[in-house]
Amino acid sequence: KGDPAEWMRDACYGEDTLEVSTAIAVGVVVAQPDYPYSKATQKEVIDIPIYGVTSKNRRFIAPQSVKMATMPDMDDDELVEREMWATAGDYLCVVTGTGRSIKQAAERAYKVVDDLHISDMIYRDDIGEKIEDELPTLQEHGYATECEYE
C-alpha cells in the first residue's frame, strides 16, 4: 500500500513504512489465439480494439501487449473514432481480483474480464479452483495458514 518510492526511500534511512495488504489476489491472463504458441503473425494479432476498459476497472488490468490507437467505436448510434487500447501482440493483459478468499478474488477478476470485449479473446475460466483441493494439504504443512478458499 502507498507510494513505493516513499517506502524505498524510508528503508534507506532505516524506517519500515511498508504496509502490506493481507488480501488474496488472483490473476487471469487474457490473450488471443494462438497464445502461448505464438505462431500467429503480427498482422493477425495487432490493431484489434479492446473495448470495455473504463476508469473504474482500469486499475485491475495490467496491460502487456497493448498500445494506444485510434479505433472505431459507437457513440449512441453513431460510429466514431477514438483513442483506446488496441492489441500489439497475443499476450494482452492480466486482470487481477482481490478479496478475503480465493473464490472472492477470482469472482472479482472474472467480473472485470467479463467487461472486456476483444475479438477472439481467450482466457482460462478455472483460475483458483485447483487450490480448493490442495489448500488443506498445504495448511497441514504450515503454508497458507490464513488463507481461505471460500
Where are these regions (language model features)?
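Active-site "cap" helix and flanking loop/linker of ATP-utilizing ligase/carboxylase catalytic domains
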Residues: 1-63
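A cross-kingdom feature marking charged/low-complexity
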Residues: 127-150
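Short arginine-rich
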Residues: 81-83, 111-127
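Predominant activation on well-ordered alpha-helical scaffold segments within soluble catalytic domains
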Residues: 5-9, 106, 110, 128
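Generic long, charged, amphipathic alpha-helical segments
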Residues: 39-94
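Short, well-ordered beta-strand elements within core beta-sheets of diverse protein domains
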Residues: 28-29, 91-99
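A generic structural signal for well-ordered coil/turn residues at beta-strand boundaries
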Residues: 22-25, 89-91, 123
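Short, well-ordered alpha-helical segments
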Residues: 97-116
